């Protein structure tokens, strides 16, 4: 019997008890970061910009492939997701996080739970707290949304359902653009399904809120990490904060281009391409002027499918860089080794 995504995450719980929200007018010591807390905290910033790709460009596959190879991240326009839907998901996210704390806590993630309100799963790997709050959706949000909005939760559930539908189609399209640039064909990935549309894949929607911060240079919204996914698609409101790291230039900010989405390569796509596409380290910084919201679609394979480097992308004279493993197995490694996981499993 195959595992649902909820089962996968539940089998590797990372529970961080919810503490009282910080006083948003001052920065407590528990929220004050230094390079001792994260070696890359003060790494240099760069004026470089992420590639911005118009998905209607006739050379889109080449552009996506090049961005995946050189950056592991890029921004996209003309992606086909209705602007009305992006407005709706942003409105939902803002409405959720503006609820009174006690109301949000009614939908708090349980100790062995996956969905609901809480802090980032990566928080357990750091000594300092992050200046953010989140809400995780896996499957139907009906149970949790009913607690938050007793009288009008159904319209919010419909927004999530429509958002997921559009994101899944977009993720599949981007996947084929990226892999197609490497010469990968539909027959090379059996688990893409009979129509090669990746209908059996699974995903998490992560809603994030980064309140304005009195001392943003000493705080961290979401610490540096890679995603345990094939691909992540993020929509951010009109406030900058997302940064990606490249060894040769340092931290690069992804500016909020109206209507655009940010895409980043995850650990599993790095494995699938035998290391050709880097799984990019990224983080979220905060500011003292305005709150920031982001909505991430974390897309992965069917949870029990074996993921391994595609034979077409492995030098016949060398062994694959990574072994075969399921998403479930990889998450078990990530739950223990965090950002060292790819190094740990490498052949």
Curated annotation (Swiss-Prot):
Residues binding Fe cation, per UniProt: 225, 227, 282
InterPro entries, alphabetized: DIOX_N, IPNS-like_FE2OG_OXY, IPNS-like_sf, Iron_ascorbate_oxido_reductase, Oxoglu/Fe-dep_dioxygenase_dom
GO biological process terms, semicolon-separated: gibberellin biosynthetic process; response to red light; response to red or far red light
Domain Fe2OG dioxygenase: 197-301
Enzyme class name: oxidoreductase
Pathway assigned to this chain's UniProt record: Plant hormone biosynthesis; gibberellin biosynthesis
Cofactor details (free text): Binds 1 Fe(2+) ion per subunit.
Induction comment: Not under feedback regulation. Regulated by phytochrome. Induced by red light pulse and reaches its maximum level after 12 hours. Transcriptionally regulated by LEAFY COTYLEDON2 and FUSCA3. Not regulated by cold treatment or auxin. Up-regulated by paclobutrazol.
Keyword Metal-binding: yes
Enzyme active site: 292
Catalytic activities: gibberellin A20 + 2-oxoglutarate + O2 = gibberellin A1 + succinate + CO2
Result of knocking out the encoding gene: No visible phenotype; probably due to redundancy with GA3OX1. Ga3ox1 and ga3ox2 double mutant has a severe defect in seed germination and root growth, and a dwarf phenotype.
Matching Pfam families: 2OG-FeII_Oxy, DIOX_N
Annotated keywords: Dioxygenase, Iron, Metal-binding, Oxidoreductase
Keyword Iron: yes
Coiled-coil regions listed: none
Record GO terms (molecular function): gibberellin 3-beta-dioxygenase activity; metal ion binding
Name by which UniProt lists this protein: Gibberellin 3-beta-dioxygenase 2
């Amino acid at each position: 019997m195959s595992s649902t995504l909820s089962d996968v995450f539940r089998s590797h719980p990372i529970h961080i008890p919810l503490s009282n929200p910080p006083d948003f007018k001052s920065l407590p010591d528990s929220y004050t970061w230094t390079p001792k807390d994260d070696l890359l905290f003060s790494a240099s910033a760069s004026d470089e910009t992420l590639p911005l790709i118009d998905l209607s460009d006739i050379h889109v596959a080449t552009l996506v492939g090049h961005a995946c190879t050189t950056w592991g991240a890029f921004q996209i326009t003309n992606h086909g997701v209705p602007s009305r839907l992006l407005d709706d998901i942003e409105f939902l996210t803002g409405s959720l996080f503006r609820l009174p704390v006690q109301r949000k806590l009614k939908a708090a993630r349980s100790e062995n739970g996956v969905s609901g309100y809480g802090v980032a799963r990566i928080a357990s790997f750091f000594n300092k707290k992050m200046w953010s709050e989140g809400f995780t959706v896996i499957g139907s949000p009906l149970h949790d949304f009913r607690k938050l909005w007793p009288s009008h939760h159904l319209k919010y559930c419909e927004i999530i359902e429509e958002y997921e539908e559009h994101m899944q189609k977009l993720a599949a399209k981007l996947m084929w653009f990226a892999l197609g640039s490497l010469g990968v064909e539909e027959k090379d990935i059996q688990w893409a399904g009979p129509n090669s549309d990746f209908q059996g894949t699974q995903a998490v929607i992560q809603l994030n809120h980064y309140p304005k911060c009195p001392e943003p240079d000493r705080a961290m919204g979401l610490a540096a990490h890679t995603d345990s996914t094939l691909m992540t698609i993020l929509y951010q409101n009109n406030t900058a904060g997302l940064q990606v790291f490249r060894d040769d230039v340092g931290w690069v900010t992804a500016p909020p281009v109206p209507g655009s989405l940010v895409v980043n390569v995850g650990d599993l796509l790095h494995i699938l391409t035998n290391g050709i596409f880097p799984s990019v380290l990224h983080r979220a910084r905060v500011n003292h002027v305005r709150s920031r919201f982001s909505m991430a679609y974390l897309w992965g394979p069917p949870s029990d499918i074996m993921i391994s480097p595609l034979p077409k992308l492995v030098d016949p004279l060398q062994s694959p860089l990574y072994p075969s493993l399921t998403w479930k197995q990889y998450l078990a490694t990530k739950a223990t080794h965090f950002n060292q996981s790819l190094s740990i499993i490498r052949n």
